[in-house]
Amino acid sequence: STLCARTGLEVLTLEMPIHQHSDQASRGQEHQNWLAANFPKTRHTQVDLTPVYDHFVAAMQPGGADHDLSLANSRARLRMSTLYYHGQANGLLVAGTGNKVEDFGVGFYTKYGDGGVDLSPIADLYKTEVFALARHLGIIESILSAQPTDGLWGDDRTDEDQLGATYPELEWAM
């Protein structure tokens, strides 16, 4: 979002909680406040997707070995639909957050979810480079020190827990 805001073009950021942990929500809000203070063409809105997701879950019949994974990925797809609604309604593009390790190294994204974007400004950067860029851009410390997580499971598992390796290990392998 900061790279998009630095273009000087209009930027709309969306907070889309789905049973989100309070620390994740507060970090997001802190970042939105920082963006608004530093980039006048940035605006923010919140769309609480929890009720929509809960209705979706209630309509699904539990079954199959991948039921929990299917529900987790449904969160990413619901967010993608919301991003594209707001993008089209406002004449804006959807920018992604995927990096070289996640999108091209190990495929750690949800097809038609967080992988469904119009542009990927950090797609060519390793995760460690993303953090270095974030430090250079003055991103708030609470985000820099947070363990990366997709927030799709409703628990405290991190990206590295799910991947079974650290980002530096994955970068070394790549």
Segments (PLM) and residue ranges:
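ATP-dependent adenylation/nucleotidyltransferase module used to activate substrates
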Residues: 1-105
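Conserved active-site and cofactor/substrate-binding residues in soluble primary-metabolism enzymes
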Residues: 23-26, 78-81, 125-129, 164, ...
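Short, charged low-complexity intrinsically disordered segments located at boundaries
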Residues: 59-64, 159-167
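Catalytic subdomain that performs nucleotidyl-dependent activation
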Residues: 93, 97-165
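Short alpha-helical "packing" element that flanks the helix-turn-helix/winged-helix DNA-binding module
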Residues: 169-174
